[in-house]
Amino acid sequence: MESIEQQLTELRTTLRHHEYLYHVMDAPEIPDAEYDRLMRELRELETKHPELITPDSPTQRVGAAPLAAFSQIRHEVPMLSLDNVFDEESFLAFNKRVQDRLKSNEKVTWCCELKLDGLAVSILYENGVLVSAATRGDGTTGEDITSNVRTIRAIPLKLHGENIPARLEVRGEVFLPQAGFEKINEDARRTGGKVFANPRNAAAGSLRQLDPRITAKRPLTFFCYGVGVLEGGELPDTHLGRLLQFKKWGLPVSDRVTLCESAEEVLAFYHKVEEDRPTLGFDIDGVVIKVNSLEQQEQLGFVARAPRWAVAFKFPAQEQMTFVRDVEFQVGRTGAITPVARLEPVHVAGVLVSNATLHNADEIERLGLRIGDKVVIRRAGDVIPQVVNVVLSERPEDTREVVFPTYCPVCGSDVERVEGEAVARCTGGLICGAQRKESLKHFVSRRAMDVDGMGDKIIDQLVEKEYVHTPADLFKLTAGKLTGLERMGPKSAQNVVNALEKAKETTFARFLYALGIREVGEATAAGLAAYFGTLEALEAASIEELQKVPDVGIVVASHVHNFFAEESNRNVISELLAEGVHWPAPIVINAEEIDSPFAGKTVVLTGSLSQMSRDDAKARLVELGAKVAGSVSKKTDLVIAGEAAGSKLAKAQELGIEVIDEAEMLRLLGS
């Protein structure tokens, strides 16, 4: 007679097998009723023997108790976004850039996939068992949604098959099929619950439930599309090969993934998917096109927050017609005057749209737009609504001309338009309340100075009450002054003051980004900080010197140079430093002057370390003159292999690069 442990093992194995056939192979071999019977049998046995329940049991998908809030998970490998193209010409230009950058006659093949309209997630398996899952978040840090992801039946709690890596992080999309979406909304209308505008919102709402039991009731599903972390194992050297391997291990992969041998085949794939879009049963908003060869991907690399080897080819956005009620003018952080059409509300691609950007005066002229016109609205990239054209054949008799302002609608300063630029700008600078508000909101934002609790409404009140004129004024605020604001009690006020004090300790890159210099984003700010090292060196840099920084051209260099040439900007910076804003001095290391076995060497760490964290090891190696790289190449001098070292170790051995273990690293660090 079988033992209880044997019965449980057999039931779990059988259920996992049928989940694989149903969700991955799309070829169920037993009726739903039989699956339900097996699940009931397993559940009854586990109820009688709770000490034998395992985390990867199929019964554990039902969800645990509600969470008070989501904790954060930092992505070991950033979850990057993709650049978009919207027409054939743009895709062909991307194709040419790839061919030119590779600078070889080697053929490029493309792996083409559906661009699912859901939520990007990262799922980590250790020794084949699901241990954590996270949202994309800001690409660096996401929310811990492990409990909710465990309830999605398409996602295996345990991988099956051979040669499963010690650590494998898969990336993919959680989405809601249209039938499931309609059922959720039907139930919500019947019970008076929340009705979702589209399947993506419903998927997001379902996945971000603090109560996993609610998520478990939603028919979410999942497709894999990539890998993040890989340790203690190997994967094929093509993107398609990796997806096929995922499928062998039990991970669901779309059956529409296609290998294309040319740009013409990619375009044919795009048009076929566009034709089939209405019958897929789930929402997509384009196709994703990736260089299939991992070696070529590595050669192409990345720019800022996106890879050079992949692109999202978006479908034409959905369009609707409505009327323009009025045109208003908004003033942005850098003084840009943006006309905004106020519309008769209309649903476009599942979202109620009441405003649409008109971009600038040239666009209004191009459209021939008048207030009262009937217009076609498009959600560009399915995100930002814009006016596509005016329906001239249905123009009402009482339309009015759109008059672009010559004075700022907020502060009354002159509006000027520099020759060669499409954007008109308010010349008021920080005397303009709108610019001041937007500049301050940018300054305190999470990726800039990161002042916790300093929201938009607080900034609005501070500017309106004339408490704050420049960023430096923020650090002069007291709890007493803040308490006078709406919805700001003594405790909240003190929390903001404490957050401002904490924010004084920053990095040079964050500080530069926070200043809001035109066209200086996070990546450019980081590049400037790394290249010049000190504020003094950057302030003194010429336009020619600035252009030596990677990705800084004449336009950005001019903006940076002009910013520091402006006396009022230098005064604000001096005030900020006087208020105590500071960052660590740059560490300048001359490898030739360091007596260390690591000095001047390019070192790669792989696998997990037992005696110190990887960040601590990196910091110590840098102190000793090493350059720590993220991947193995012919330029690598040394690889330090910890536990469960994977493909990096294999590549090092293949290239004949010196490899040492953690014990030897510690010995050398101690010497």
From Swiss-Prot:
Main enzyme class: ligase
Pfam families the record matches: BRCT (PF00533), DNA_ligase_aden (PF01653), DNA_ligase_OB (PF03120), DNA_ligase_ZBD (PF03119), HHH_2 (PF12826), HHH_5 (PF14520), Nlig-Ia (PF22745)
Annotated NAD(+) binding sites: D32, A33, E34, Y35, D36, S81, L82, E113, R136, E173, K290, K314
Cofactor: Mg(2+); Mn(2+)
Record key words, sorted: DNA damage, DNA repair, DNA replication, Ligase, Magnesium, Manganese, Metal-binding, NAD, Zinc
InterPro entries xref list: BRCT_dom, BRCT_dom_sf, DisA/LigA_HHH, DNA_ligase, DNA_ligase_AS, DNA_ligase_CS, DNAligase_adenylation, DNAligase_N
Gene Ontology CC terms, in alphabetical order: cytosol
EC number from the UniProt entry: 6.5.1.2
GO terms under biological process: DNA repair; DNA replication
Keyword Cytoplasm carried by entry: no
Location of the BRCT domain: 593-671
GO molecular function: DNA binding; DNA ligase (NAD+) activity; metal ion binding
SMART domains tied to this protein: BRCT (SM00292), HhH1 (SM00278), LIGANc (SM00532)
Catalysed transformations (reactions): NAD(+) + (deoxyribonucleotide)n-3'-hydroxyl + 5'-phospho-(deoxyribonucleotide)m = (deoxyribonucleotide)n+m + AMP + beta-nicotinamide D-nucleotide
Binding site for Zn(2+): C408, C411, C426, C432
Catalytic residues identified in the record: K115
Domain of life according to the entry: Bacteria
Function: DNA ligase that catalyzes the formation of phosphodiester linkages between 5'-phosphoryl and 3'-hydroxyl groups in double-stranded DNA using NAD as a coenzyme and as the energy source for the reaction. It is essential for DNA replication and repair of damaged DNA.
Family the UniProt entry places it in: Belongs to the NAD-dependent DNA ligase family. LigA subfamily.
Protein name: DNA ligase
